[in-house]
Each structure stands twice: as C-alpha cells, then as structure tokens.
Amino acid sequence: DDRDINKHMGEPSHPHVPWSKTVIYELHVKGFTANAPWLPPELRGTYAGLAHPATLSYLQDLGVTSIELLPIQAKQSELFLQERNRTNYWGYSTLGYFAPEASYATKQAQEAGAGAVRQEVIDMVRAMHEAGFEVIMDVVYNHTCESGPEGPTICWRGLDNLSYYRRTKDKISRLYDTTGCGNTLDFTNTHVTTFAVDSLRYWAKRIGIDGFRFDLAATLARLDGEFTRYHPFLYALRSDLLLGNLKMIMEPWDCGPNGWRTGQFGIPFAEWNDRFRDCTRTFWLTDVERARGGETGDMTMQSMATRLCGSADLFATDPGRGSTASVNYVACHDGFTTADLTQYRHKHNEANGENNRDGSDNNHSVNFGHEGPCSDPIITQQRERAIMNMLGTLLLSLGTPMLLAGDEFGNSQNGNNNAYTQDNETTWLDWDWLYSTEQTAELKLFNLTSRLIALRKARY
C-alpha cells in the first residue's frame, strides 16, 4: 500500500503553484507541436516534442503556470469513426486507464515498447516541472471506449457488464447514458470507485501528475440518477492523502436530467465556469453587435461585474470557498477558438462527416459583417479589438483563468466548433508567424497576452 502523502508533496521538482497564481493553458500533445518548425520531424507531435527546451521556452515567455493536457490515457476510436477512416483526435474514448496513449510517443519509443512510452511521458512531466510548470491531465472516467450496445466488447463489458455500466431501473439490459457516448460507468459500485482512484493515484505518484480535470463530472456524482456533492467518489477524492492535495477541476455538467451543476461541487474542487464564458462572449460580441443596431443587449453591467469579481453567486456559497474555484475561460477545445468567435456566426463542421449536425449552435459568436477570413481593414480591426477585450477580461478577472492553446496568437479552426475528428491542419497549431520578420497581428496579440498574464501575476 503506497497511500502516503510524502511521495508527491515531498518532491521539490513539483512547482506547487498556489491557486491564486495559477494560469492554466489547455493544449493537445500532438496538435501543439505537430507543425512546430523548431523541432526535428521525429519529435513533432510527441511527448518528447512537448518537453523540448524550445517548446518550454515558448510557454515560459507566454507566462502560463499550469499545462492542462487533453486526454493522454490510452484510447480507441469509436466504431462509427473507424468505419469512416477517422479517429477520435481529442481522446475522450479511453481504453486503458493505467497506460499512456502510445501514438503520442516518438517512433523510437513505440518500437521499444510500452516501458519506453511510459518513460517518455515521465520525462516530459519532469521537464515541465523543471521549467516551472504544473501538469494537469484531462481524464475521462464517465464512460469508456466500448460505447453503447452496438460497441465492441473489449474489457469491462466482458469482465462484468452489469456492474461496470449503469442501467435503467425499468430494464436492466438497457444502458443508462448521461454522457452522450453510449455508456456510463457506474460509480455507485465500490469497485468502480476503487478502480478510478487507483488509476488517479498511479498517474499522480508514478508519473508525477499535479492535478486532474474530470470530464462530465456531474455523471461521476450521481446517486439514483440525481447529483449529490456527497457522492462516495467525491468523498474518496477529498479524503485521499495524495489526491486531496492535488488540483482537481470539474466539468460540472453532463447530458442527463438536471445536468448543469456549476458551483455545486464544493471544496476542494475547482470548476469550469460556463457562466463566465457565455457572459464574456455575450458582453463583447453579440451585445456590441446589437448596440450598433440600436438594440438593447442581453447582458447587464451587473452580470458582467459579477463575473469579473469571481462569480460569488456560484462559488462563495460554502465557507472557505472563494473565487479561485471558478475556472474562467472564453474558449476551450470544445467549441470555437477565441478568434473564430469573431469570424463565424455559424459553425462549419462539414469536414466532420456528420452533415454539420454535430457541435453546438449556441456559441454567442458574431462575424462583424463577413463570414470567415476577411481582408477588410475595418472588420479586421473590430475583430482584433473584440479578441483583446475577451482575453483582457479573462486574464484580469478574479478566478482561475484558462487559456486555450493558440488563442494567444489568434489561432483559427476555420469555423469548426467540434473538431474532435480533425487530426490534421485544422487542429494542428500553425507557427509560421513566429518566424516572420514583420510585426504580425499574431505577434502583437501574443505580446499583449503575455503582458496581461504578467500584470495578473503582479496584481494577484
């Protein structure tokens, strides 16, 4: 039994950034460096590429403190994607909860075997720690890659189908799905909770991870179908001597009834604040557009002030819980990038092969008179100003800011707001601007973002 606090907390290499100083940066291991010209080809899109000194130097220049990695646990794409020769690029289709995703390792490590892949991940985490960064993992314990009844039998379905997956009360053969992914792990069963906690402890203690972001966390806290902050799984996280001292961030919703639970998880959990996201977008985008047309906007100054001051209506309801529990963001992997919020009024997900039915239609986005890229100087100026306003609001508000990788230089996904299948140039960051001899718009925005982060650090 290795359940002690000393292994992780006693290692001086862990930065242990206070919540009040934390600036989170969400990135995809492959997409961040797949096009990185500073890396040799064999390191691009890999754990080793992310750990390269030049990569870390860029992140240091930006000023963020905590790197949140999209899922890096071993994954398997859903059958319907495989049949279309597509992959689940984001990785929210976990196959192995104790194993890193091998495809993000260098070819040399993959050929050497699982041990070499694991070591490459450990080396990446250590390099980030030495550079001053915390490493937070996005983890998916709400469902598995086995999907619904039509999905494959790979592991849990074959081991103990009735125990691992939640069932409807009226028909035990029917899966109860609150994730939108075909199945839901049943955290009312003790062995499921134990399995998840052991997995988290492995990543924290053996790999060196500093925190976790829990996908669709409302699902993890349902008893008899209803959300409760007193769920045994949440209690297990709070009370564990190792995990209870790490950063734990909840995505406080799921697809089930009464699934939106922002602000309700309590201490010690932080939560993604969708109210901040929607308020900031509305205030600087759709309301500005309405005002120009002589209409009244949706967002009052009082509502905006509440978000600027830490969303006390959501996160000051428990004694000792403050604004840092609010993870503020304007954009994340799931949705438009910040730049695309100013270029596209409508989603453009045709490349996903689902006839543009996938992805949210509720984006609070505008296009300033032209859908997509535009060379008109007035429209360009309006878009740049809106981006700066949103990033300024994000980085200077009370709470814990989270920046989407690429937003600091105006990255676009060409209007795709659900790029989960796009393992290509759509999601791979374009770094050409770094090597331009001119004062590009990307460089200007990067410099502004880094100054805002520096100002935040000096203030808080």
Which positions does each model-derived feature cover?
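Active-site rim elements
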Residues: 9-14, 186-189, 220-224, 317, ...
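Conserved alpha/beta catalytic core and glycan-binding cleft of carbohydrate-active enzymes
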Residues: 229-405, 409-410, 418-422, 460
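Hydrophobic faces of well-ordered beta-strands that scaffold small-molecule active sites
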Residues: 23-25, 67-69, 135-137, 212, ...
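The feature marks proteins involved in alpha-glucan
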Residues: 1-28, 33-45
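Short, flexible loop/turn elements at secondary-structure junctions
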Residues: 28-33, 54, 73, 96, ...
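Acyl/amide activation-and-transfer machinery of modular secondary-metabolite enzymes
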Residues: 420-431
